[in-house]
Design a protein with these regions (language model features):
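Generic alpha-helical secondary structure signal
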Residues: 34-37, 150-153, 157, 337
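Hydrophobic, aromatic-lined core segments that form the binding pocket/scaffold
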Residues: 168-380
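Charged, amphipathic alpha-helical linkers/stalks
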Residues: 124-205
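Detector for Asparagine
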Residues: 7, 38, 71, 82, ...
Length: 380
């Protein structure tokens, strides 16, 4: 089957023991059925503690998924002190589960092609994007798809192009993208409609209209603060990402209580000047999210809208966490590792499956599809 992937995809190399945020710690490591059956017959390396009869004994069933049971330090029991894998050292790569073998690669199998991307929840991927001025994404050959699917792929391509090529800020373009998606849902989708919505004149008018709108910064900061707290609550209870989350949530609680001793809006203005230097990286991150997450093999226009909401919320909490970290670090120069680590941890925390995204939105909001104003509130 035809394989399509972005220009950066073949450049990825795992940094193994040099990785600053290992994928062998603080999140679910799935074990596929074939690996699980194989592990029933294999003894653990002698330096794994505690010793058990077979590798399968180190797994557990969690949220309908078989995973490796983490130790008290929330690490994989097979992770050595030097951050290398005991299983690989003892048995080679073939012993690993599919998750360990493929991460951070992501595959989506459509009717006539497979799309491959890399996920932002790996520091080495963010490092790759930092070095790329502009990511390049493949187009889907119209002859491979039905007319309906072609229109959906065209929607995605237009959104990617808008984010990559429009000189406005990434936040401004997110607002344009979401507005166009909502408007498209009200009419019969066609190539002519898309050509009109994404024409230079219509985009210009939409951009001017957004520029004239007032988005109270205090409300944006307050809502993003609540979103971060809500997304983090379960991770905090389980003691996951505590080194990253604990100082941020302490500051977030102070903001919610109104006990911070400085003007957040004034600090935000200074922060934005620091954050601007990473605009190319943020644009690469968002365009990759568009390519990898907006359209699934069973997707439609509504699911694209829902995924755009999730991407918008994801970005809002990433940006807010970077802001809080910058505040807690003394409001000086915004370091690259702060931006990278926030992208990695928050995308791990928001890396929900499609059904889980719908469940979260149903439980947290009155309607699955947001008003444009709410999207503008958190992303503006």
């Amino acid at each position: 089957m035809l394989e399509l992937y972005p220009n950066y995809y073949p450049k990825f190399t795992c940094t193994a023991d040099q990785c600053p945020i290992t994928c062998c710690q603080e999140w679910k490591i799935s074990v596929d059925d074939d690996t699980y059956r194989n592990w029933f017959t294999i003894q653990p390396p002698t330096d794994v503690a505690p010793q058990k009869a077979t590798l399968s004994a180190y797994t557990t069933y969690q949220a309908e998924t078989r995973v490796i049971r983490l130790n008290e330090q929330k690490k994989c029991p097979f992770l050595k002190e030097n951050r290398l894998c005991r299983l690989v050292l003892a048995y080679g790569d073939a012993i690993l589960s599919e998750t360990c073998t493929t991460f951070p690669r992501e595959f989506h199998t459509f009717s006539n092609h497979v799309e491959k991307t890399l996920m932002p929840s790996c520091p080495a991927v963010i490092d790759l994007w930092k070095e790329e001025t502009k990511l390049s994404f493949p187009s889907v050959d119209a002859s491979l798809c039905s007319d309906t699917d072609n229109l959906l792929f065209s929607v995605r391509s237009h959104l990617i192009s808008l984010m990559q090529n429009n000189p406005a800020s990434p936040e401004h373009i997110l607002l344009e993208c979401f507005y166009i998606l909502l408007e498209s849902q009200q009419q019969t989708l066609s190539s002519d409609l898309l050509a009109d919505y994404f024409s230079e004149s219509v985009i210009g008018q939409l951009s001017d209209a957004i520029e004239q709108m007032d988005f109270p910064l205090e409300d944006t900061l307050s809502e993003c603060n609540e979103l971060l707290q809500d997304l983090a609550v379960n991770y905090q209870k389980e003691g996951l990402y505590s080194r990253f989350l604990t100082p941020l949530l302490a500051l977030a609680d102070q903001i919610s209580a109104g006990t911070v001793t400085y003007d957040l809006t004034e600090e935000w203005d200074t922060f934005e000047q620091q954050f601007f230097q990473y605009q190319a990286l943020i644009r690469n991150f968002l365009t990759n999210e568009f390519f990898s997450d907006l359209l699934s093999p069973d997707g439609d226009l509504e699911s694209i809208i829902v995924q755009m909401q999730w991407i918008g919320m994801e970005y809002a909490v990433v940006r807010h966490s970077i802001f809080l970290k910058w505040l807690s670090d003394g409001k000086g120069e915004l370091r690259y590792d702060v931006v990278r680590d926030s992208l990695v941890v928050l995308t791990r925390m928001t890396g929900y499956e499609k059904d889980d995204i719908y469940e979260y939105l149903e439980n947290s909001f009155e309607h699955i599809i947001w008003d444009w104003g709410y999207f503008a509130l958190i992303c503006g």
